[in-house]
Amino acid sequence: MSTRIAFLKGHGTENDFVIVPDPENALDLPPAAVAALCDRRAGLGGDGLLHVVRSAAHPEARGMAAEAEWFMDYRNGDGSVAEMCGNGVRVFARYLQHAGHVTEGDLAVATRGGVKTVHIAKNGDVTVGMGRALLPAGDVEVSVGEREWPARNVNMGNPHAVAFVADLDHAGDLYAPPSHAPAGAYPDGVNVEFVVDRGPRHVAMRVHERGSGETRSCGTGACAVAVATARRDGLDPAATGTPATYTVDVPGGTLVITERPDGEIEMTGPAVIVAEGEFDSAWLEGVLA
Ligand SMILES: N[C@@H](CCC[C@H](N)C(=O)O)C(=O)O
């Protein structure tokens, strides 16, 4: 028997998500189902999917239930699992507010990258405490076609390679993932950011996301870019005791990132619920058959 399954559509700087509320974790969402839902022609369409589950109801989040009532079970558009999604967690918080589960102010959200603190401001922007960046040692390089660039390896819970380029167009059409070297640098794949300067503490980026392709924004990517740019500029808040704030333009908008002297990184930007509706479980079963 077919049932109606609720979904919403939301975005943060045009990094867009299918949102599936499922508080008791009753839905089966294998990778193929996620990919079908995120398909832009035959499905609902999104860079990724936010499965909204109570932490106590999800085996990966039970240990965080005392700290955070809700778990962001994030999936990339191809159905793969990622540790963290910075825009996703801001849109996730906006959904919780929209659904009446929380009001503006602070809330904790469980993710595979740990518990994140999110602040829903009165002016509408959503800020997330992203934790600290790790900067693994060792040179990495990314390439697209004939062009190659040295890149900074930054881990924001998920892996990134940040390359400073002369022109964002040099990254090409980004239909295929950029190559990277050495081959073993990212055993689980990598998100690749291309960065140009726009002004003092102001950069612009494009991104090719692991599991989603080129997207119009990536929150963890923007944080990786802010940290890589700060180090390139000779700024290390932990050493100087002074926070470093960068404005990061992405194709879908602007994010503001601050790295504090304790290493904690905060990211602020818009998070929007666009629509809500229902799909028929029979459609999904048909796609998966
Ligand atoms: N768009 C996200 C990142 C999503 C996960 C990424 N594709 C990965 O596989 O690590 C963001 O806003 O951070």
Swiss-Prot record:
Amino acids binding substrate? 15, 76, 86-87, 158, 191, 209-210, 219-220
User: Which terms are listed as keywords in the entry?
Assistant: Amino-acid biosynthesis, Cytoplasm, Isomerase, Lysine biosynthesis
Q: Where does the entry annotate site (Could be important to modulate the pK values of the two catalytic cysteine residues)?
A: 160, 209
Q: Does the keyword Thylakoid apply?
A: no
* Family matches, as InterPro entries: DAP_epimerase_AS (IPR018510), DAP_epimerase_DapF (IPR001653)
Choose any GO biological process term that the UniProt entry carries and state it. Answer: lysine biosynthetic process via diaminopimelate
Q: EC number(s) on record?
A: 5.1.1.7
Could you cite one Gene Ontology molecular function of this protein? diaminopimelate epimerase activity
Q: What class of enzyme is it?
A: isomerase
- Pathway(s) the chain acts in: Amino-acid biosynthesis; L-lysine biosynthesis via DAP pathway; DL-2,6-diaminopimelate from LL-2,6-diaminopimelate: step 1/1
Which segments does the entry list as coiled coil? none
Q: Which residues form the active site?
A: 85 (proton donor), 218 (proton acceptor)
Single GO cellular component term: cytosol
Superkingdom of source:
Bacteria
The principal location of this protein is: cytoplasm
What catalytic activity is recorded? (2S,6S)-2,6-diaminopimelate = meso-2,6-diaminopimelate
Q: Give its localization.
A: Cytoplasm
Q: Report the function annotation for this chain.
A: Catalyzes the stereoinversion of LL-2,6-diaminopimelate (L,L-DAP) to meso-diaminopimelate (meso-DAP), a precursor of L-lysine and an essential component of the bacterial peptidoglycan.
Subunit structure, interactors included: Homodimer.
Kindly provide the name given to this protein in its UniProt entry: Diaminopimelate epimerase
Name the source organism: Streptomyces coelicolor (strain ATCC BAA-471 / A3(2) / M145)
Q: What is the lineage of its organism?
A: Bacteria, Bacillati, Actinomycetota, Actinomycetes, Kitasatosporales
